[in-house]
């Protein structure tokens, strides 16, 4: 059974969960996972303040986020192996700087999906926001490897400063799609 983290109720203030990494939680007890500090506005609070936690990632190397996590940022950031499934919507920076593994979102994802990604696979069954696979502001390299699949629509500036990898959008894409210029 995977480790399941269920959002009790949607928050209006974003919760940043970059401290909840699959590589770390598969070695931790449920109580340790519940006490993991996450950023909520300008303070750090235990994960258990917003989420119910059950199961274990020790055997499956799988982490499941349940609920409308559209205000939950940095799910799967820096993922290197294993599988993350979001049963619902995902917030900004999904899979940012990941180097391996797989992330599946059954709903929509906000901006910066796969930002500065180095490898792995991200699939969003709904729509994605702006700057999919892009470099962060001031950065020089966006996505350098990996695969991002968006079944629905995606916003503006897809693949900004992207070097390698593949981004496929099944629906409509916004403005300023970045692509390599061909020599004349």
Q: Where would I find each of the regions flagged by the language model?
A:
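Long, distal/terminal scaffolding or interaction modules
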Residues: 1-184
């Amino acid at each position: 059974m995977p480790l399941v983290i269920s959002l009790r109720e949607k928050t209006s203030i974003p919760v940043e969960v970059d401290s909840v990494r699959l590589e770390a939680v598969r070695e931790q007890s449920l109580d340790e996972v519940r006490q993991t500090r996450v950023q909520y506005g300008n303070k750090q609070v235990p994960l258990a303040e917003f989420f119910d936690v059950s199961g274990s990632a020790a055997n499956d190397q799988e982490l499941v986020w349940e609920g409308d996590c559209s205000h939950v940022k940095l799910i799967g950031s820096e993922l290197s192996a294993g599988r993350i499934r979001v049963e619902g919507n995902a917030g900004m920076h999904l899979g940012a700087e990941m180097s391996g593994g797989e992330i599946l979102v059954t709903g929509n994802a906000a901006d910066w999906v796969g930002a500065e990604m180095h490898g792995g696979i991200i699939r969003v069954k709904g729509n994605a926001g702006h700057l999919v696979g892009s470099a962060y502001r001031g950065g020089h390299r966006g996505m350098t490897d990996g695969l991002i699949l968006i079944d629905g629509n995606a916003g503006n500036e897809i693949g900004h400063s992207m070097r390698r990898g593949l981004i496929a959008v099944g629906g409509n894409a916004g403005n300023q799609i970045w692509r390599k210029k061909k020599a004349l």
